Amino acid sequence: MQEIIGTLLLMAVNFSQYDMPEQHPLIEAVNHQQLIDTLCEGKECNALAYYDDKKNTIFYDDKLTKDSMIAQGYIVHEMVHFLQYQHDAVIEEPDCKQRMLLEREAYQVQQRFLRSHHIMTYDVDMAIRLLSGVCSR
């Protein structure tokens, strides 16, 4: 993925409201168990990537390959979170609705990216729909 990080960042910028930042995030492949431990408290889950704003790093499942447009879509999604932090769109201690707005934006950019490559976006479409009910629980 390292060799296409600039291209994926450019795609995230093109499909979002953000300007190109001066710096790029770091990107690091990790095993799936590390994602589970970090994001899901050690319980099996479908986590594939996340952006760590403290380390300025996108961590992604080492099974994702640069040749997969779906995998690239996950990285573009996380690039949006990087851009949100770079442009101060994330407030300190956001509430549920604010977090879901940020997440929706990342999914919408991922959706645009995939559609631009003529890839069906059923999973992303479903995630966007589900976000609207998360904070009402």
Q: Can you say where each PLM-predicted feature lies in the sequence?
A:
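Catalytic Zn2+-binding segment of zinc metalloproteases
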Residues: 79-96
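Short alpha-helix carrying the canonical HExxH Zn2+-binding catalytic motif
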Residues: 67-84
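Sequence contexts marking disulfide-bonded cysteines in secreted/extracellular proteins
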Residues: 39-46, 95-97, 107, 134-136
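Post-HExxH zinc-binding segment in Zn-dependent metallohydrolases
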Residues: 94-129
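Second-shell loop/turn segments in exported
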Residues: 61-65, 92-99
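Auxiliary, metal-adjacent structural segments of Zn-dependent hydrolase domains
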Residues: 1-58, 63-64, 68, 115
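Short, intrinsically disordered, charge-biased short linear motifs at domain edges
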Residues: 25-31, 81, 119-124
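Hydrophobic (often cysteine-bearing) scaffold residues that line and stabilize catalytic clefts
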Residues: 1, 72, 76, 102
